[in-house]
């Protein structure tokens, strides 16, 4: 990579995680599908157990509560997204792997992720609409991902060069807003391909900020 900036996929200080047995993994896969397609509040433990082919007792033995199932659902999806994004950024060809190119690659990665995993938009944004209480253990997963994305955009903006640190931080925040707004528009299906539109706007922002 041209910049040498490593994209960390780890999350720190997150909620407690559950050790996964095969039955727990089946339950988590069912919960992910149901929560994402129907919403967290609309899905009960009975339905998750039935879809996974496990008993309610098994669910409670493994997870302890529906709250913890929600935590595992979001944390698992977050981990997979971070790994996917890091892989996509690492794949930017070295001669072209400038910070600006990697910023645009974030939008490309989100577009690819949404094509395969995101018919209803961002799972974190959707979950936050249902779980706004900061005391809910899943809240840390949701905000943790968004803070991580902000740090990624800001770090790449600083690496782009040609602008002072304060301007780079503002650029990072603006790129974050573009990205998150496009995710919401994707879920709402307001207009076609909002992430491609956001990428074009990001390119224009970068050109204006760095003169390249």
Predicted features along the sequence, with ranges:
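N-terminal intrinsically disordered/low-complexity leader segments
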Residues: 1-22, 210-212
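Amphipathic, non-transmembrane alpha-helical scaffold segments
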Residues: 20, 28, 70, 74, ...
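Generic hydrophobic, amphipathic alpha-helix propensity
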Residues: 23-32, 48, 73-81, 85, ...
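Helix-turn-helix
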Residues: 26, 30-68, 72
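Amphipathic alpha-helical segments used for helix-helix packing
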Residues: 116-136
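Hydrophobic/aromatic-rich alpha-helical bundle segments in the mid-to-C-terminal region
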Residues: 137-147, 159-205, 209-212
